[in-house]
Protein backbone atom coordinates (compact mmCIF):
# COMPACT_ATOMS: atom_id res chain seq x y z
CA UNK A 1 0.00 0.00 0.00
CA UNK A 2 1.25 3.47 -0.89
CA UNK A 3 1.37 5.81 2.14
CA UNK A 4 1.58 9.59 1.77
CA UNK A 5 1.76 11.89 4.80
CA UNK A 6 2.49 15.61 4.66
CA UNK A 7 4.36 17.82 7.13
CA UNK A 8 4.84 21.58 7.00
CA UNK A 9 7.04 24.40 8.25
CA UNK A 10 6.78 28.16 7.94
CA UNK A 11 9.30 30.97 8.12
CA UNK A 12 7.75 34.38 8.67
CA UNK A 13 9.17 37.86 8.08
CA UNK A 14 12.50 36.53 6.83
CA UNK A 15 14.86 39.35 5.79
CA UNK A 16 15.02 38.82 2.05
CA UNK A 17 12.95 40.00 -0.88
CA UNK A 18 10.41 37.47 -2.24
CA UNK A 19 11.58 38.31 -5.76
CA UNK A 20 15.05 36.99 -4.88
CA UNK A 21 13.86 33.84 -3.07
CA UNK A 22 11.27 32.58 -5.60
CA UNK A 23 13.78 31.48 -8.29
CA UNK A 24 15.67 29.51 -5.62
CA UNK A 25 12.43 27.83 -4.49
CA UNK A 26 11.77 26.71 -8.08
CA UNK A 27 15.04 24.73 -8.02
CA UNK A 28 14.02 22.43 -5.15
CA UNK A 29 10.31 21.85 -5.72
CA UNK A 30 9.59 18.11 -6.16
CA UNK A 31 13.12 16.97 -5.27
CA UNK A 32 14.18 14.53 -2.53
CA UNK A 33 15.06 16.18 0.78
CA UNK A 34 18.77 15.28 0.71
CA UNK A 35 19.18 16.61 -2.83
CA UNK A 36 17.24 19.80 -2.03
CA UNK A 37 19.41 20.56 1.01
CA UNK A 38 22.58 19.91 -1.01
CA UNK A 39 21.39 22.31 -3.73
CA UNK A 40 20.45 25.03 -1.23
CA UNK A 41 23.66 24.93 0.78
CA UNK A 42 25.82 25.00 -2.36
CA UNK A 43 24.19 28.27 -3.50
CA UNK A 44 25.83 31.55 -2.47
CA UNK A 45 22.52 33.42 -1.99
CA UNK A 46 21.21 34.60 1.37
CA UNK A 47 17.73 33.42 0.38
CA UNK A 48 19.04 29.89 -0.18
CA UNK A 49 20.29 29.71 3.41
CA UNK A 50 16.92 30.95 4.73
CA UNK A 51 15.03 28.47 2.54
CA UNK A 52 17.36 25.68 3.68
CA UNK A 53 16.50 26.35 7.31
CA UNK A 54 12.76 26.12 6.62
CA UNK A 55 13.18 22.91 4.58
CA UNK A 56 15.24 21.38 7.40
CA UNK A 57 12.56 22.38 9.89
CA UNK A 58 9.85 20.69 7.81
CA UNK A 59 11.94 17.51 7.57
CA UNK A 60 12.59 17.61 11.33
CA UNK A 61 8.84 17.91 11.92
CA UNK A 62 8.31 14.85 9.73
CA UNK A 63 10.95 12.81 11.56
CA UNK A 64 9.61 13.90 14.94
CA UNK A 65 6.08 12.74 14.17
CA UNK A 66 7.20 9.50 12.54
CA UNK A 67 10.22 7.94 14.27
CA UNK A 68 10.65 5.25 11.58
CA UNK A 69 11.16 7.84 8.86
CA UNK A 70 14.58 8.37 7.31
CA UNK A 71 15.83 11.33 5.27
CA UNK A 72 15.73 9.25 2.07
CA UNK A 73 11.95 8.89 2.28
CA UNK A 74 11.23 12.65 2.47
CA UNK A 75 10.41 14.69 -0.63
CA UNK A 76 9.74 18.41 -1.00
CA UNK A 77 6.18 18.85 -2.25
CA UNK A 78 5.25 22.53 -1.98
CA UNK A 79 7.36 25.65 -1.61
CA UNK A 80 5.55 29.00 -1.49
CA UNK A 81 7.23 32.38 -1.08
CA UNK A 82 4.88 35.25 -0.24
CA UNK A 83 5.32 38.91 0.58
CA UNK A 84 6.01 39.67 4.21
CA UNK A 85 5.98 42.97 6.06
CA UNK A 86 7.59 45.97 4.42
CA UNK A 87 9.64 48.34 6.54
CA UNK A 88 9.55 51.81 5.05
CA UNK A 89 12.00 54.55 5.89
CA UNK A 90 13.15 57.84 4.41
CA UNK A 91 16.36 58.26 2.48
CA UNK A 92 17.54 61.89 2.45
CA UNK A 93 18.56 63.17 -1.00
CA UNK A 94 20.05 66.37 -2.37
CA UNK A 95 18.28 69.75 -2.24
CA UNK A 96 16.05 68.84 0.68
CA UNK A 97 14.27 66.02 -1.09
CA UNK A 98 13.66 62.54 0.26
CA UNK A 99 13.09 59.11 -1.27
CA UNK A 100 11.21 56.24 0.28
CA UNK A 101 13.33 53.21 1.10
CA UNK A 102 11.44 49.91 1.33
CA UNK A 103 13.01 46.93 3.10
CA UNK A 104 11.07 43.85 2.07
CA UNK A 105 10.65 40.56 3.88
CA UNK A 106 9.08 37.26 2.90
CA UNK A 107 7.07 34.39 4.31
CA UNK A 108 8.22 30.90 3.26
CA UNK A 109 5.91 27.88 3.45
CA UNK A 110 7.38 24.41 2.84
CA UNK A 111 5.45 21.15 2.70
CA UNK A 112 7.27 17.81 2.62
CA UNK A 113 5.81 14.36 2.32
CA UNK A 114 6.98 10.88 3.10
CA UNK A 115 7.07 8.35 0.35
CA UNK A 116 7.20 4.75 1.46
CA UNK A 117 5.61 1.43 0.76
CA UNK A 118 4.18 -0.45 3.69
CA UNK A 119 1.13 -2.07 5.13
CA UNK A 120 -0.85 0.35 7.28
UniProtKB/Swiss-Prot annotation:
UniProt key word Ribonucleoprotein: yes
Molecular function GO labels: rRNA binding; structural constituent of ribosome
The keyword RNA-binding is assigned to this record: yes
One cellular component term from this protein's GO annotations in UniProt: cytosolic large ribosomal subunit
GO annotation (BP), single: translation
Xref: SUPFAM superfamilies: Ribosomal protein L22
Protein name, per record: Large ribosomal subunit protein uL22
UniProt source species: Borrelia hermsii (strain HS1 / DAH)
Gene: rplV
